Amino acid sequence: MSKIRVYELAKELNVSSKDLITLLMDEFGVEVKNHMSAIEDEEAQLIKELLATKPEYVEGSLEDSKSLVDEYEEILQNELNKAKKKRKKNKREDKDDENEELETEVIEIGETITVKELAEKLNKPSNDVIRTLIFSGVMAAINQEIDFATAEKVCESYGVILEKLEVIEELEAVEVEEDDEENLEKRPPIVTVMGHVDHGKTSLLDAIRKAKVTDTEAGGITQHIGAYTININGEEITFLDTPGHEAFTAMRARGAQVTDVVILVVAADDGIMPQTKEAINHCKAAGVPMVVAINKIDKPGANPDRVKQELTEHGLVVEEWGGDTICEEVSAKSNLNIEKLLEMVLLTAEMLELKANKERKAKGTVIEAKLDKGRGPVATLLVQNGTLHVGDAIIVGSTYGRIRAMFDDTGKKIKSAGPSIPVEVLGLSEVPEAGDRFNQVKDEKTARIMADKRKDKEKSDSLMSGNRVSLEDLYSQIKEGKVKELGIIVKADVQGSVQAINQSLEKLSTDDVKVRVIHGGVGAITETDITLATASNAIVIGFNVRPDNNAVAQADKENVEIKTYRIIYDAIEDVKSAMIGMLEPEYKEVILGSAEVRETYKISNVGTIAGCYVLNGKLQRNAETRVIRDGIVIFESSLSSLKRFKDDVKEVNTGYECGLTVEKFNDVKEGDILECFMMEAIKRKEL
């Protein structure tokens, strides 16, 4: 039977706990110690009926209690007599309860709380709380988490009410907010420029923006992630100036799909280089369309046709050769064909039908963030949907804030920013990380609570092992439906080995699991490989190469598996063995034995007992059994009991008689054949 606490009932009835306790003890004879005591639902219902008939009780008046009791005299006579005897005894307790109620404290927690945090909320020494837990049968250290029910027992012993923190607007609900088709409008494409070092990525952005930022950057390497919006023929394009593909993939690893189109810059005199190849693989893994810009075509030794030939080797066939990859020959230095390249970007974006709803709450991604001495945490946000205004409350990853000021890419103060517009904002509580998602919420309090919840979740997630794919747990992850594809990154000492391993691995694909080599390259296993593996939930296989120290540290941090081999066959066999373990075993039926029913006996509360003679093999108790009549299987079940004379036995061999019952089947007749069998699992040895 369910119960309700006194203070909860008092709150429902809009009376003080003190008055309710008096009513319970004096008029109903229900003995309660204080406002934390629990009473039966039946008694609570009776009190509700009493107060419903006499609303003056709700005002806190107890003077007319005698006349009310008269109305319920028959029901309550026994309780009244008991209550009179207990009044004197409970007077002192009532006084204590009054004082206790005045000091009653209510604290709120989430699903779990550490012992230390609970002690701080109760304003009690940690040792006292640990002692209370031990008396409750819970052994917990100071930094150990306890659940809500355990914390509630501790609080009850201190006379404190514990309430579960009210969940305010889950971020997931904000993320999946759907837009009406009629509210969607065309938005500018977001473009990332990628390519090998010194192939002219920043120079190309210079030519596009008509501003010389290259000269201010050391060594020709971009020093930061910037975001700029340009206007061409009345249409806008937003460019993210990333240091190659590392930031692109790092953001994707954090769940942020920012880029709509990638401009792949390839120098006409150099052709496809290792970082170009990496950029291509990263784009393919992310499923982002590419527009190839063959740069430096005005340079001596430029050979655009060789570049196009090399592109085909990586699955990118240009349009003029019958493929679907848009390719433009440009020169950032002499500003040649830049307009044409941008038109191709807009054409690609048009095919993608990029739309957003600027009327909804804003959401997007952090492009970069830093701590400024004078301005505090500063973040560059890319609005991907909705409109962001100064004064909006936002949650960004596990931090939050209210936007105090907003600047565009030229440093000009603005009041709002729509879809695909990058802005720099002030007002966050902490510095977020690049790739963090941001969402606008109704107020700062909501943002703070959601950020705290996110921090708690991150803390609990960090205590649990990551769910990255490894060869050892591949089978269990497949069964749980977590993995449908095994992504592999291959690094080897020579290109021939890379190609050999790639071809061998991809041949292992089955209907259940596809093996996909995301990236193959020559050289040591680096941080870049681990970053790509993190983003793609892949494993890294090295042949005659080793990971560097930074790669090992990052792999440990991200729970990415690195396997190194000296023999190609071993690498193939390891992946094959993991996949064979994933395959469902084949089952073969093994006949144990059969028996003929010679007599049947019906016994009440037991059913039909069959007296049988074992013809061949043996019968086993609990074995799968089929009942065959005139050569036709009429029922399949199992042997629920098996006896020889009066003794229970596990099995009966050929030539012996026995008595048995078939589970859930009583229609056994003389002449029936009972066949015992088992299904034997046979491990798959081939894919």
UniProtKB/Swiss-Prot annotation:
Residues 295-298 are annotated as: G4. Belongs to the TRAFAC class translation factor GTPase superfamily. Classic translation factor GTPase family. IF-2 subfamily. The lineage of its organism: Bacteria, Bacillati, Bacillota, Clostridia, Eubacteriales. It comes from the Bacteria. One of the essential components for the initiation of protein synthesis. Protects formylmethionyl-tRNA from spontaneous hydrolysis and promotes its binding to the 30S ribosomal subunits. Also involved in the hydrolysis of GTP during the formation of the 70S ribosomal complex. This is Translation initiation factor IF-2. It is found in: Cytoplasm. The gene is infB. Residues 195-202 are annotated as: G1. GTP binds at residues 195-202, 241-245, 295-298. One of its GO terms (molecular function) is GTPase activity.
